[in-house]
């Protein structure tokens, strides 16, 4: 089951509300005439279809029919249609959509002016056409697809009412409203009543950040190891060159001693080399002596070239 499906499953366990039903009718509903006025609400999510059916019964005592058919596209998804014959006109009146469903493409004005209905409407909008990327994979993104630009921009206004900086883009004849910041996505999930999903998202975000930190730490350590290995090999090459040229015996005792220890312990760290000296020497002191050997070797090579 996808992360989006998990969120929608949780949302359908919320209480039936007019605001959620209103969004589903506005975004997924279509009016027809078959022995009178009919209303169809379509979704590809079985749980959402059942939720619509239950809300119609609980809120308006309307007994609908759920019809299932297969999509003809390559996706082969099932499509669920909640079909209302008796009471369709009365329902549209109750939802204040009787005069606007086919004419007005935005969010109804009375929704924008009611704090509680706005939250419920957002829940319905996500159930209707929402998607949430798995936070463990790829980028953070929550989106709601809209057929009409006006509706997308009205939703954007509602998002901003709740401090959420949503953006709207056009993609494949749809207007997509989306959030891309993890904190705002978590706030939205809390707002629409998906607390389990919010906690799961936050946990995945933390784990992803910890893995990223561990990878950066590992890369940093590997880079340091590589630098240390290169520096050690450079010193060994310099000492061997000086030895071939009979120059080691001309060096001060402190440099001769560190040269001997470096050759005898090629895999030792700078710290370990320092501890082998008597008296022990710190890392900066060991590095200083090894650099002197490399400089002496380079100077000799310049003279010979």
UniProtKB/Swiss-Prot annotation:
> Which residues fall under the DNA-binding region feature?
269-302
Set out the biological process GO terms recorded for this chain's protein. cell division; regulation of sporulation
Q: Key word Cell cycle present in the record?
A: yes
Signal sequence, renumbered to the chain:
none
Which InterPro entries does this chain map to?
Answer: Homing_endonucl, Intein_endonuc_central, Sporu_reg_WhiA_N_dom, Sporulation_regulator_WhiA, Sporulation_regulator_WhiA_C, WhiA_LAGLIDADG_dom
- Which GO molecular function, any one, fits this protein according to its record? DNA binding
Annotated keywords: Cell cycle, Cell division, DNA-binding
Q: Which family does it belong to?
A: Belongs to the WhiA family.
Q: What does this protein do?
A: Involved in cell division and chromosome segregation.
Q: What is this protein called?
A: Probable cell division protein WhiA
Q: Which organism is it from?
A: Lactococcus lactis subsp. cremoris (strain MG1363)
Q: Which gene encodes it?
A: whiA
